[in-house]
Regions:
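Conserved SAM-binding loop
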Residues: 149-151
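Membrane-anchoring alpha-helices and their flanking helix-loop junctions
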Residues: 1-146, 155-218
Length: 218
């Protein structure tokens, strides 16, 4: 709970300190949806004590490339929020999208969170890091969204990640967030290779579910 409260406080600080204003309505939309998603996540995992422990304190075996991913992607995501706040709240570099475009971006943002949460609930091995969870008896998840693509959690992350700058009202923030999205796609490919090599029955699962990220596309 302390960690969750701290995360919410940091998110609020990034959004509203960077914009320099509290009447930043796009910031409030982003903040409220993000907090609602965090609260729903806590409720969905209310009986998944093993998964909660794994996500808070992952076991041994995190891959070196995953450490590199976090070192690069975290500042990019934070930077995107800061750039968006400065852009929309102070400098006004970006023109405001129309109501229809903004509504569409918000819908995709919410959809991304929904897909991410669905995957998190369906997969009891939804760790926060890339590792083989031999200590937890990891098996292949074939339930829920995993019937349609092999990495639905990353699909959800891509959707709400790429929509974050637009929900915050900034086109310029797409630059750092776009780089973060490229890194996430690379992480997905590396993790899929790791699972194919080291997780029992994953190669057979790949034959049954052909799509890596986008169902029916790739």
């Amino acid at each position: 709970r302390v960690r969750s409260a701290l995360g919410i406080a940091i998110l609020a600080g990034l959004v509203f300190l960077s914009s320099g204003r509290l009447d930043y309505w796009q910031g409030w939309v982003f903040f409220c949806v993000s907090v609602a998603a965090a609260m729903l996540s806590a409720w969905l995992l209310r009986d998944r004590f093993g998964l909660i422990a794994e996500r808070l304190h992952p076991g041994k075996g995190m891959k070196w490339w995953d450490k590199g991913y976090f070192m690069l992607s975290t500042p990019l995501y934070i930077g995107a929020i800061i750039v968006a706040g400065i852009d929309t709240g102070r400098r006004h570099w970006s023109s405001s999208p129309g109501a229809m475009i903004y509504g569409l971006c918000l819908a995709v943002f919410v959809l991304g969170h929904a897909v991410f949460l669905w995957a998190k609930r369906a997969n009891p091995f939804f760790s926060s890091v890339a590792r083989i969870q031999s200590d937890r008896g990891q098996t292949v998840c074939r339930e829920g969204p995993y019937k349609f693509c092999r990495h639905p959690g990353y699909l959800g992350g891509l959707l709400f990640g790429l929509m974050t700058p637009l929900v915050l009202g900034s086109y310029w923030a797409l630059i750092p967030q776009g780089l973060a999205a490229v890194l996430l796609i690379g992480r997905t490919c590396l993790e899929d290779r790791m699972l194919t090599k080291d997780l029992l029955w994953y190669a057979e699962y790949k034959q049954a579910v052909r799509s890596l990220l986008f169902p029916g596309v790739w």
